[in-house]
Amino acid sequence: QKVVDAIVAAGGTAVANGDDVSTMEGGANILKTALDNYGQVDILVCNAGILRDKSFANTTEQDWDLVVKVHLKGTYCCTLPVWTWMKDNGKPGVIVMTSSGSGLFGNFGQSNYGAAKAGIYGFMRVLSIEGRKYGIRVMGLAPGAFTRMTSDLPGRKDREPDPMSLPENVAPGVLFMVSDLAADHSGKVLGVSGRGVREIKMLQTKGFNVTKPYTAQDVAAHAAEVFFPEEVQRTPA
């Protein structure tokens, strides 16, 4: 509601919706709210999330299920109704799914969150392929920002955030993604934070090519071809 109030105060129009994103009913109601108020849907940004950070040994089944349900299933539940509406009505559009450096690079204490965010990356990649014939563009966002959800992370609690780390500095990157300026970039992930905007990409090496049965020792002998050089490894923001 705070964001809605800010948009209205600035002369725009906006409505809030409090449905549960992790249910099919909630996802359908979010679409209905948009259609009831604006008549069509052009953009969906899936950004709802929670944290239950613990080391894997201390993560309960409830911790796992809750985080995966909100992030991964929530992305599915919100995307399906919008996808179906765009497809059935012949309306091109843009869907942005929020992944994370935790899912793309890994981060201690976030096995549930990292698994969900990696799943969102795979989901985004598949839909970017399937969406081509419908004119539906799908991109991934890996944001870095000081938010209510991340304010209790180690090193952030009781600390004033750097102004450059606020969500306001992620918004321009997302605006680029949903605009026609990014028309040629479906299927890509952008890391967006106070330090800038960059593409995050999954790559493979040329590898060790075989023409006959091989052994584990053969793989080890060709390790320089199999693995990336250490200097090209990428780390999250």
Predicted regions and their residues:
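Active-site helix of classical SDR
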Residues: 79, 116, 124
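C-terminal helical subdomain
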Residues: 140, 160-237
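Substrate-binding pocket helix/loop in short-chain dehydrogenase/reductase
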Residues: 55-56, 63-65
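The beta1-alpha1 cofactor-binding region of Rossmann-like NAD(H)/NADP(H)-dependent oxidoreductases
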Residues: 18-29, 61
